Structure formats: C-alpha cells, structure tokens
Regions:
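Long, amphipathic alpha-helical segments that form or neighbor coiled-coils/leucine zippers used
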Residues: 269-306
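Exposed aromatic-hydrophobic patches
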Residues: 90-93, 98, 124, 130-140
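Amphipathic, heptad-repeat alpha-helical segments
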Residues: 195-257, 299-306
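Amphipathic, non-membrane alpha-helical rod segments
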Residues: 239-279, 283
C-alpha cells in the first residue's frame, strides 16, 4: 500500500539551528589574494523548496533537480525509496561545472537533506567528472526533507553554505498525494553572495581550451582536491580559535595533513593521499565544531584542550 507523500514548503531564508558554515563566519583564507579580482554581488531572495514526506515502506519514487541562480543549466534526478525506516537516494546530475568556478574556496559539492524544521544533514560529496556528470548513492534516517546541492570549501561541513546550486523539484509521476502547507520557518539565510568573476572566467576558459595550464590525471586531481580541502578545513578551524579550545584535535588534523602532503610528494596518484586528506578534513571540522560549542557554552574546564 502506498504511503502518502506530503510536500512541506521550505522557505529559503532563515538560519538553521546548527553550527554555522565556516564561510558564513570566517573570512576566506585566500581572500587577501583574491581581493583585487572583480566581484559580482548577487542578492538571493526568498524562495520555496519542497520537502517530501517519504514515509515508511513507500514504493520508489522519482524527483528532479533544477539548477538554482548560481548554475541554472545544471540538472539532475533521483530515485528515492524508504526501506525499514531508512530512505535510500540514488541520484545523478549533469551540466555540473567544477565548484572552483565560484572561487578558490569552493572545492566540493555537497548533497543535503533539509527538514521542514531547518535541520540539515550532509548526505555526501558530489564529484563531477570531466564531462560535468556526477552520481551519488546515499541514505538518511530522516523521513521528511528537501534535497539541495551547495558549493562548499570542503566535503565534511555540517551546515550548508548560501551557494545553492541545485534544489529538488517534484515530477508529475512522483508517488503519492501531494499537499502543500504553509511553512513557519525558513531554510537558509538571505544574504549577498560574492562571485569571483576572475575565477569563473579562468575556469571556463580552461574548459574551452583557451587557458594553457598543467594537465594532470584524474587520480592526481583527486589527490590535489583532497589536499586543498584539508588545508581549507585546517585554516577555518584555526581561524575559529581551535588552537585554544581544541588544540589536541587541531594538532591531529595538522599531523594527518602533513602525512598526506608527504605522501603526495612521494606518490601523487596514491589513494592514500585522498584517505589521509579526507581524515584530516573531518578532524579539522571536528576541531572547529568543538571550538564553536565551547565558545558558546563557557565552562570552568573550557580552557583545557580536547
């Protein structure tokens, strides 16, 4: 028996009740170097993104992804199925340009499930291939959520940035009855987003063959992106004050990053580089979150590093 699928309108303009995205609270680690580049300011207005109640034991259903203001030509689709309380998502996208076209800080795309209450869950990194296509199979225990894709400084962020690239869109054949209700919350903060036009232009010229840069293999490219994400994560953690509030965790992240750097120098295509870099990224994000929580909830033993 088919469960009813309800649509809850998620208005895209209020802060989520989670730790802020690193880009929302700290300056870009490379901002000084990029300050001379022309910036294009984009005002993102409120809009509605549907959240679907997939329920329990529903039949597989399909949803589409539509490109948002930053990349309107991007598109995708997903098959969503609930099994024993776990919702499985098999998604694919096309016309998904590299996140680096938005600036040096954007190194990853992340798929998010966002509940009507505003809680966001990172469902995994999306890695476009040379043909601007990507796939991701993932799952969540959330039952009612919207799906969005954002550009991020690294894969392990715990709060979406404002750079929403894609958002889910209902299809005519979506399983179940659709009901739209008024939401009393908003999904993402309204804000002004700076696009680095020089980065966009350089990226697009490189894809069109107008820019002559060093070409590397796919494996080496993955190693480099992993290292850059880890460096970003460490810098954001340091800027948040992790050296004082989460010194041990931050040092662990730095040690992992150093091992990844040395492994890359010895063997750029080694899978170990990506493994170490991703562990460094996650550990650095842990240090940043520990720092934010300790700063917001002072305690007598707060000065002691984790």
């Amino acid at each position: 028996m088919r469960n009813t699928a309800f649509i809850l309108a998620c208005s895209a303009t209020v802060l989520l009740a989670q730790e802020p995205n690193p880009l929302a609270q700290t300056p870009s680690p490379v901002a000084a170097a990029a300050s001379a580049n022309p910036l294009y300011r984009v005002d993102v207005v409120a809009r509605t993104t549907p959240a679907v109640n997939y329920g329990h034991r529903t039949l597989p259903t399909r949803i589409d992804f539509a490109g948002a203001v930053f990349q309107p030509d991007a598109q995708g689709e997903a098959v969503v199925e609930s099994k024993r309380g776990v919702v499985h998502i098999d998604a694919k996208w096309k016309n998904l340009a590299s996140p680096q076209r938005y600036g040096a800080n954007y190194l990853a795309y992340v798929l998010w499930a966002v509940t009507p209450e505003g809680r966001a869950q990172n469902l995994g990194e999306i890695s476009p291939d040379s043909g601007q296509k990507a796939k991701l199979e993932t799952s969540t225990q959330l039952q009612t959520f919207a799906l969005i894709v954002t550009a991020e400084p690294y894969y392990s962020v715990t709060q979406p940035s404002n750079v929403v690239v894609l958002e889910n869109k209902l299809r005519p054949d979506t399983v179940g009855r659709v009901q739209t209700v008024d939401a009393k919350y908003e999904l993402l903060p309204r804000g002004r987003h700076s696009l680095d036009l020089e980065a966009v232009r350089a990226h697009d010229e490189q894809r069109s063959g107008k820019h002559s840069g060093k070409r590397v293999s796919r494996k080496e490219y993955e190693s480099l992106v992993g290292l850059y994400q880890a460096r970003n994560a460490v810098q954001f953690a340091e800027h948040a004050g992790a050296a004082e509030h989460a010194a041990t965790t931050l040092q662990k992240a730095k040690t992992l990053l150093d091992r990844a750097e040395r492994q890359y120098a010895a063997s750029p295509k080694s899978a170990t580089v990506v493994t170490l870099a991703r562990e460094a990224t996650q550990t650095a994000e842990d240090a940043r979150l520990i720092t934010l929580r300790r700063r917001s909830s002072p305690a007598p033993d707060q000065a002691a590093a984790l």
